[in-house]
Amino acid sequence: MTTMFVRHTVSNYSVWRKHYDEFNGIQKAKGVKAQSADNPGDITVTHDFPDLETAQAFAKSDELKTAMRGAGVVGAPTIWFTNKV
């Protein structure tokens, strides 16, 4: 299993959260297995995927980029991946 971490700053947590929750169907369709977020304004989200390739494809998807813009993400996110051992 691969976990993708995404950290970014948002201009307004409430706006970001609404968009994040509305994006749930696309997340699941792209292979997201779990999710969490906390600390308004400085967001770290984790998503679990079956493998690295699926996680990387989701991270590069146009749907994710569009959703982040609409949600008020400020600047480029920091994204990294881990594998369970």
Set out the residue ranges of the language-model regions.
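Short S/T/G/P-rich N-terminal loop/turn motif that feeds into the first structured element of a domain
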Residues: M1-A67, V73-V85
